[in-house]
């Protein structure tokens, strides 16, 4: 690159050029440009002294001087078009394709006036009047009327500019001495992160003197082969000056970037070659056609926009850190609020920052307050996460600098109004991914060339708003976690940037909820999100997240509505319904073994042991008792197969209600006998009441007690009583449930075989019931005490019959037990060949055995006592066979010797004795015993 010297008093200004950096001076302010008050006409750079530690007094407002520069504007328009042509031709030499559209400028003369001030020689030989500040964008003058000249400052300035302009010779300076001053941000740094530096000591509010700071312009350094700029630039980004948007000669005010209007240097990332080639060719073609301009303005037309302020980089670093760590940022917010860009403008946060010797620290975005400036919007992101590095591409050139201004507005048309307090900002919206092309909602006259490069970003979305989505804007909060949720998951280089396309559409997804005054999500939102998430996992728990008004409408759940699946014996988990009861497998096996093994369990306690899952094996007696009380029957499942109607019809068509009471443990003993499969009739207490109702009335013997007892008269009275009782048995048997279902021959046979047993058993009951077993109560008119028994001829037989009431007294037999035992006596003797209706007989007998067990359970509580009583009662029934046998023998002998003994036998009784007693005594009958002898 050839050596460049400033020959003309003016330098072209490219409208829309992004800001360029100056090493050590990344200061930004409102987009207002003002020339140097004291123009210097020297070929060399101005020599100014270093800025003091404090910035107070450096920036102050300047009144307008009312100067007019019409000739400068005309000359600037012509020179600017020439320079743009040369710049386009120079870009074409890079050999890459692509094109970019540039909007025509609106007021190129005004821009040239600013460039004239920038490139005006500072020597005493040349002097050009500078336009007043009122004819440019603002009436604020950046510096005082006279800047003190400091000779040592010139070499430093030259060292800064020499690598940028590729100057050779002694003006290049020592690059090693300014290595720290050449530090810039990485290539991928977002052009949106400018540093807001308010004037120290005075907030930008209405009525207060405002001292805006200069903003840096855009500088892009492009790498060129064979040039000395690569060695002298140090860590600067290598690039070539470019023009994002040029101003045509048609007139009109071109959009001015903040850096171009306010001063300073900014860094623009390297532009893609496919978009910059036509511009370089245009500049190279028009470069020779720019008379009256300095070589610096011709070649580096986009390099410098406003005067370079040689500020102390150490001061800037200290001031930058102070601004980043300061709690109050009202000055920067006020300065940013003057020209706040539209909410849909993505380029509001797209101005780059050049850092001198700053570390990789965070920079607030352009026109964005500090974290605590607007706490209502809940910006939880720390400053270290507010910087965004983007990939190299054409994003910088795609952003139009006109987006910083109101649409259709001229930056020179803004009058000098005092800055008011910052306006209320819209809620923050999430930015887009880095590397994504930004389509700017700029004025209609400025078209933007966009280039999107694919980039992936990890977005941390932790909240999902249910209401309307927040409005997109430059104050979008970074997607970070809420307070207390830990650090943000996004890396520094993966933070998303504002998406212009989403902002222009205005329909971006709402990713942030409404926040409270403390920056935290409202409780109603948290409950709604929690309730929404619970609908997918745990729906019954939605009642815990409901308003108070819905609390009374929520369904109430209780244990009654849940299915019972526990063992009724021990409380363990039930495996099914075993033997008619819902039990576990352990209790099922225990009950089966206890019933089949005929174990005689005894409780070591008081028959009230606790039977649960842990202690169920401690007391088998109490466990078996509980099984019987629950209703477990060994043949319970087998009995369900038979039809109830058929069995009821078998029981003499007497309707028996189904058992509903709690079964007792006496059912254990019923399984020790051979049951028929048709035993579906379970005799229950109502059946016992039926037996009580069919009990025969009191039968009188017709004995004359006024006469002394003789053997013949006493026996004759007993025979008459027997005849009446036999008729009563026939009548009772016909009313007995199930008996008439048997064959008629079977009915007669059973009555003939059991009539003696029934009469003696009734005698014992009456004796036990009326005289407590002290006498033989044959009838109310025939009661034999011991004295009368001794005087009789059948005293031995009376002693035999007297045993029955004594057993009743001993066992304290109840009426229910007596009624059941009486029925079993009717069914305890059958012929050897069996009965014609043997099956129905067995079913009927088994049913009454179970009824006896129930009758025992009405008084005996516990398995062991019930079993013992069942044994005693059934043993008594077995013993009656021998006793009745003695009566049969005595009756048959008396019947045979009736004439000799002068004893009368009634007709029916005579037929029964003559027909059946010889068979019974001959052993031609089969007694049914409960116990083996």
From Swiss-Prot:
Ranges for region Disordered: 1-48, 66-255, 331-378, 415-454
Cross-referenced PROSITE patterns: NR_LBD, NUCLEAR_REC_DBD_1, NUCLEAR_REC_DBD_2
Chain segments carrying region Mediates transcriptional transrepression: 165-305
InterPro entries in alphabetical order: NHR-like_dom_sf, Nucl_hrmn_rcpt_lig-bd, Nuclear_hormone_rcpt_NR3, Nuclear_hrmn_rcpt, Progest_rcpt, Znf_hrmn_rcpt, Znf_NHR/GATA
GO CC term, one of those recorded: nucleoplasm
DNA-binding region: 567-639
GO molecular function, one term: zinc ion binding
Domain of life according to the entry: Eukaryota
Family in the record: Belongs to the nuclear hormone receptor family.
Protein name in UniProt: Progesterone receptor
Gene coding for it: PGR
């Amino acid at each position: 690159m050839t050596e460049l010297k400033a020959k003309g008093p003016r330098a072209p200004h490219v409208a829309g050029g992004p800001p360029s950096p100056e090493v050590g001076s990344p200061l930004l302010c409102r987009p207002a440009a003002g020339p140097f008050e004291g123009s210097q006409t020297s070929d060399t750079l101005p020599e100014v002294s270093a800025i003091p530690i404090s910035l107070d007094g450096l920036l102050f407002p300047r009144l307008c001087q009312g100067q007019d520069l019409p000739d400068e504007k005309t000359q600037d328009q012509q020179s600017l078009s020439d320079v743009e042509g040369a710049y386009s031709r120079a870009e074409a030499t890079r050999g890459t394709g692509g094109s970019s559209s540039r909007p025509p400028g609106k007021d190129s003369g005004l821009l040239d006036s600013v460039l004239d001030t920038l490139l005006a020689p500072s020597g005493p030989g040349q002097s050009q009047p500078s336009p007043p500040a009122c004819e440019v964008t603002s009436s604020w003058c950046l510096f005082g009327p006279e800047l003190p000249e400091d000779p040592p400052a010139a070499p430093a300035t030259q060292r800064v500019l020499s690598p940028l302009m590729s100057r050779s010779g002694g003006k290049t300076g020592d690059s090693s001495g300014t290595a720290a001053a050449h530090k810039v941000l990485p290539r991928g740094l977002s052009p949106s992160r400018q540093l807001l530096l308010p004037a120290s000591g005075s907030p930008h509010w209405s009525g207060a003197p405002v001292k805006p700071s200069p903003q840096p312009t855009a500088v892009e350094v492009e790498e060129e082969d064979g040039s000395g700029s690569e060695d002298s630039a140090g860590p600067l980004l290598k690039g070539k000056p470019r023009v994002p948007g040029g101003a045509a000669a048609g007139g009109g005010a071109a959009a001015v970037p903040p850096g171009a209007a306010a001063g300073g240097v900014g860094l623009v990332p390297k532009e893609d070659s496919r978009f910059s080639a036509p511009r370089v060719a245009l500049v190279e073609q028009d470069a020779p056609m720019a008379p009256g301009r300095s070589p610096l303005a011709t070649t580096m037309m986009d390099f410098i926009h406003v005067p370079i302020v040689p500020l102390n980089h150490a001061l800037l670093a200290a001031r930058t850190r102070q601004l980043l760590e300061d709690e109050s940022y009202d000055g920067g917010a006020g300065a940013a609020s003057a020209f706040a860009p539209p909410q849909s403008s993505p380029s509001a946060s797209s101005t780059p920052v050049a850092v001198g010797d700053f570390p990789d620290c965070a920079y607030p975005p352009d026109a964005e307050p500090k974290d605590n400036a607007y706490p209502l919007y809940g910006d939880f992101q720390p400053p270290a996460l507010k910087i965004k590095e983007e990939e190299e591409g054409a994003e910088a050139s795609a952003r139009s600098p006109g987006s910083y201004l109101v649409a259709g507005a001229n930056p020179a048309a803004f009058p000098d109004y005092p800055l008011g307090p910052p306006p209320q900002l819209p809620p923050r919206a999430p930015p887009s991914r880095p590397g994504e092309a930004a389509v700017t909602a700029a004025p209609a006259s400025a078209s933007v060339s966009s280039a999107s490069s694919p980039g992936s970003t990890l977005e941390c979305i932790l909240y999902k708003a249910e209401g309307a989505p927040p409005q997109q804007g430059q104050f979008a909060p970074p997607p970070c976690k809420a307070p207390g949720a830990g650090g943000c998951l996004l890396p520094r280089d993966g933070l998303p940037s504002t998406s212009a396309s989403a902002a222009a559409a205005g329909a971006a997804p709402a990713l942030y909820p409404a926040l409270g005054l403390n920056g935290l999500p409202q409780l109603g939102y948290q409950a709604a999100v929690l309730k929404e998430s619970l609908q997918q996992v745990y729906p019954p728990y939605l009642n815990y997240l409901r308003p108070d008004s819905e609390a009374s409408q929520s369904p109430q759940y209780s244990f009654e509505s849940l299915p019972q699946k526990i063992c009724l014996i021990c409380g363990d988990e039930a495996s099914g319904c075993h033997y008619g009861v819902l039990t576990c497998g352990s209790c099922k096996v225990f009950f089966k073994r206890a019933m089949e093994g005929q174990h005689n369990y005894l409780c070591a306690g008081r028959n009230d042991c606790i039977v649960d899952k842990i202690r169920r094996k401690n007391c088998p007696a109490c466990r078996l008792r509980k099984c019987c009380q629950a209703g477990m029957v060994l043949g319970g499942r087998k009995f369900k197969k038979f039809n109830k109607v058929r069995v009821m019809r078998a029981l003499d068509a007497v309707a028996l209600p189904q058992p509903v009471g709690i079964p007792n443990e006496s059912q254990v003993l019923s399984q020790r006998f051979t049951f028929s499969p048709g035993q579906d009739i379970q005799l229950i207490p109502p059946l016992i009441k039926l037996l009580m109702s069919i009990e025969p009335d009191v039968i009188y013997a017709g004995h004359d007690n006024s006469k002394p007892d003789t053997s013949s008269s006493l026996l004759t009275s007993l025979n008459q009583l027997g005849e009446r009782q036999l008729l009563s048995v026939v009548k009772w048997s016909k009313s007995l449930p199930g008996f008439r279902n048997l064959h008629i021959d079977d009915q007669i046979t059973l009555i003939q075989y059991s009539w003696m047993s029934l009469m003696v058993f009734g005698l014992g009951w009456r004796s036990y019931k009326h005289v407590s077993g002290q006498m033989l109560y044959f009838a109310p008119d025939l009661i034999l005490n011991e004295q009368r028994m001794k005087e009789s001829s059948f005293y031995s037989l009376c002693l035999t019959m007297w045993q029955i009431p004594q057993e009743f007294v001993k066992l304290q037999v109840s009426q229910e037990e007596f009624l059941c035992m009486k029925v079993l006596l009717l069914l305890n003797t059958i012929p050897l060949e069996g009965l014609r209706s043997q099956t129905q007989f067995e079913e009927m007998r088994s049913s009454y055995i179970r009824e006896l067990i129930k009758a025992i359970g009405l008084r005996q509580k516990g398995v062991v006592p019930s079993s013992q009583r069942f044994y005693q009662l059934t043993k008594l029934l077995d013993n009656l066979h021998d006793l009745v046998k003695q009566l049969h023998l005595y009756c048959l002998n008396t019947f045979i010797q009736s004439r000799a003994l002068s004893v009368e036998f009634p007709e029916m009784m005579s037929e029964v004795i003559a027909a059946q007693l010889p068979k019974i005594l001959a052993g031609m009958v089969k007694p049914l015993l409960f116990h083996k002898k």
